[in-house]
Regions:
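N-terminal secretory signal peptides that target proteins for export/translocation
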Residues: 1-7
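Intrinsically disordered, low-complexity segments enriched in small/polar residues
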Residues: 4, 16-19, 61, 291-292
Length: 340
């Protein structure tokens, strides 16, 4: 009798252990990850990318990954969210690349003037397999990497005084999207005083005349209604705002191979919005600006040529200061020629 009772107890223990193992496996398989995405912009191509990305990831992961998108700097200003990704408190942030140089100086290369002819041309260059591979590990030493690098839109300058050519920049205090020489020196060459200011702080600075003008993507300026503060907005020749969606590398690995692959694949799929929806949105933004009483200025050909000559003239010493950035720039120039 005692032997039979012992066998029953052992059998029950084995069943319990098996059930516990099954429960642990099921729990691991059902584990849900939350991917918080921070963006400083609203109602632009970044938001459209996030919408497509969210739908694809949540559907393919069968609910194992929940994507939460926070536009308009809801999770904090750009420097704080970039630090948050590096520390692992935020899974993803999508700033202009100029705000990532503190983590990885190579990010500045994307903002070299004259690289891209149009948004579509720029997306072809950034989507080139060799270019993707070259920049896949940017920031790895600081625990981040770019999940997506894209053209947010044409770079514009909104200003209290209309900008029709290089001479109009002289003595103007201009907000630029980054503090590195790549952003600062071109405007110094034009006689301006460039200041790096996070996007969330630019509107009040322009309103109270702390700055005379601000450089940003066209859709951003329209979405935040800058036309209520300053009417003239000028296309900067051969210049586009490049942004990057950086993710925490440790978090990506924590997903496991299958879910990590889903995130990467859906990010690339969603990039199609930049070449279609994003291009159309840039046109809509210009139309809206004019409808709201703003002025959209395109420099005359001779002025545009002089502008590019001035701003590109400062590039050689900047590139020479960092051999890796110089090599990256050469690779982008070669890819740009390939897709012309």
């Amino acid at each position: 009798m005692h032997a039979r009772l012992g066998r029953q107890i052992l059998a029950m223990a084995a069943l319990a252990m098996g059930a516990a193992a099954l429960f642990a496996t099921a729990t691991a398989q059902a584990q849900q990850f939350t991917m918080k995405i921070s963006s400083p912009t609203v109602a632009d191509a970044t938001a459209e990318w996030a919408k497509v990305f969210k739908a694809g990831v949540e559907a393919r992961s069968k609910g194992k990954i929940k994507v939460e998108y926070y536009p308009g700097s809801q999770l904090g200003q750009i420097p704080a969210t970039v630090d948050g990704v590096a520390m692992g408190t935020i899974e993803m942030s999508i700033p202009a690349v100029g705000f990532l140089i503190g983590l990885e100086p190579r990010f500045q290369v994307f903002d070299a003037p004259g690289l891209f002819d149009s948004m579509v041309h720029g997306e072809k260059v950034l989507g080139d397999p060799d270019i993707r591979k070259r920049f896949a590990d940017l920031g790895a030493g600081k625990g981040i990497e770019p999940l997506t690098i894209f053209i947010n839109g044409p770079q514009m300058i909104v200003s209290h005084k209309a900008i029709h050519g290089p001479a109009d920049f002289r003595d103007q205090k201009i907000r630029v999207p980054g503090a590195a020489p790549m952003y600062v020196e071109p405007f110094r060459k034009l006689g301006a005083s460039p200041l790096s200011i996070p996007l969330g702080e630019v509107l009040p600075a322009l309103q109270n005349h702390t700055i005379d003008g601000a450089v940003a993507a066209i859709a951003v300026l329209t979405a935040f209604k800058y036309y209520d503060i300053a009417k003239p907005m000028t296309y900067l020749p051969g210049t586009f705002l490049v942004a990057a969606g950086i993710v925490n590398r440790a978090w990506m690995k924590s997903l496991g191979p299958e879910l990590e692959a889903i995130v990467r694949e859906e990010s690339i799929k969603a990039e199609s919005v930049y070449s279609n929806w994003g291009v159309d949105d840039a046109k809509r933004a210009a139309d809206t600006w004019q409808q709201k009483g703003g002025q959209v200025i395109t420099m005359a050909p001779d002025q545009a040529k002089q502008y590019l000559a001035d701003v590109t003239s400062v590039m050689p010493p900047i590139l020479a200061a960092n051999p890796q950035v110089k090599a990256d720039h050469d690779a982008l120039v070669a890819a740009a020629k390939k897709y012309r």
